[in-house]
Amino acid sequence: MYDKLNVALSKDLRKKYGIRSFPIVKGDVVKVVSGARKGEGGKVAEVDHHSGLVIVEGITIAKIDGKQKGFGISPEKLQITHLDLSRSERFQKIKELANIKHITIQEEPIQEEQQKTEETKQEIAPEEVEAKEAQDKQEVKENDQ
């Protein structure tokens, strides 16, 4: 039983945050750096703390009945290429660790993403969306005739 599974960070992330490894969670993007699956990568689908393995989307193994099953990979064979900082406590921990090395980190990426989505929602009013859908339907009918 493992409490947290630490995984090495890519060189870009090491330089950006000043740390070598960080606990992996569902949503991080990883790359396999050794073993038979070297070079493959994807988003973390599941972290099995009981067996100490990480299951990555897109990396599967065939079962005897022909179905595909997620393939568990040991954390020491992985490298994090993109951190999922959607949880504020995780971002705060990164910020604290970077602060030790006197590295300043920009404003929370979550807030930036939320601002962008709010701006796009404000730009497109519901009436405009309905009008555009009606116009598209008319064009399809005209093309069919």
From Swiss-Prot:
PROSITE patterns: RIBOSOMAL_L24. InterPro entries: KOW, Rib_uL2_dom2, Ribosomal_uL24_CS, Ribosomal_uL24_euk/arc, Ribosomal_uL24_KOW, Translation_prot_SH3-like_sf. Gene3D superfamilies: 2.30.30.30. Residues 113-145 have a biased composition (Basic and acidic residues). One of its GO terms (biological process) is translation. SUPFAM superfamilies: Translation proteins SH3-like domain. One of its GO terms (cellular component) is large ribosomal subunit. Transmembrane segments: none annotated. Residues 108-145 are annotated as: Disordered. Keywords: Ribonucleoprotein, Ribosomal protein, RNA-binding, rRNA-binding. Pfam families: Ribosomal_L26. The keyword Nucleotidyltransferase does not apply. One of its GO terms (molecular function) is structural constituent of ribosome. PANTHER family: 60S RIBOSOMAL PROTEIN L26 FAMILY MEMBER. NCBIfam families: rplX_A_E. One of two assembly initiator proteins, it binds directly to the 5'-end of the 23S rRNA, where it nucleates assembly of the 50S subunit. Part of the 50S ribosomal subunit. This is Large ribosomal subunit protein uL24. It comes from Thermoplasma volcanium (strain ATCC 51530 / DSM 4299 / JCM 9571 / NBRC 15438 / GSS1).
